[in-house]
Amino acid sequence: MATYPSAKFMECLQYAAFKHRQQRRKDPQETPYVNHVINVSTILSVEACITDEGVLMAALLHDVVEDTDASFEDVEKLFGPDVCGLVREVTDDKSLEKQERKRLQIENAAKSSCRAKLIKLADKLDNLRDLQVNTPTGWTQERRDQYFVWAKKVVDNLRGTNANLELKLDEIFRQRGLL
């Protein structure tokens, strides 16, 4: 029996596309940013076999508060407290310096809920896959290498969440000589 996305999921996808409409990835092709959030949700559904619609919707929205004018209140009003709670868990505090945010991602990864950990794993997997083939505009090779090292530290604190995603991440880390 085929399953179909719910109307709420499609509204969420449309909202994410609208909010990220002016944003581009830092790759040389300047890929529309919305592709990333779609990839994260797709990784969870297809590769991690996640059927929890709240997780899949929060994956679509995982950067919406951090990177657009959307607020947690907007997310809760439109998509409910469950999705909003997950978005809150995976959102960095942009008022902090970048290095502090990165440190907190490592530290807080282990304390996250299992559902938030899934989103973080899929987010890292998509970012690392992109980084394997594209050096972001303005990044040095050293900065790129440092991102892989940092991402491994985050992933190490997310372990035990989803074997499929962890195997795919480990494959990337192995290729980079980090395992």
Swiss-Prot record:
Disulfide bonds: none
Active-site positions on this chain: 66 (nucleophile), 67 (nucleophile)
Known catalytic reactions: guanosine 3',5'-bis(diphosphate) + H2O = GDP + diphosphate + H(+)
Residue ranges of every copy of the HD domain listed in the record: 33-128
Pfam families referenced in this protein's UniProt entry, alphabetically: HD_4 (PF13328)
Keywords assigned by UniProt, alphabetized: Hydrolase, Manganese, Metal-binding
Cofactor(s) named in the record: Mn(2+)
Binding residue positions for Mn(2+): 36, 62-63, 123
Alphabetical GO biological process terms: guanosine tetraphosphate catabolic process; response to starvation
Molecular function GO labels: guanosine-3',5'-bis(diphosphate) 3'-diphosphatase activity; metal ion binding
Entry-linked CDD domains: HDc (cd00077)
EC number: 3.1.7.2
Family, similarity comment: Belongs to the MESH1 family.
Role according to the record: ppGpp hydrolyzing enzyme involved in starvation response.
PANTHER family: GUANOSINE-3',5'-BIS(DIPHOSPHATE) 3'-PYROPHOSPHOHYDROLASE MESH1
Name of protein: Guanosine-3',5'-bis(diphosphate) 3'-pyrophosphohydrolase MESH1
Recorded name of the encoding gene: Mesh1
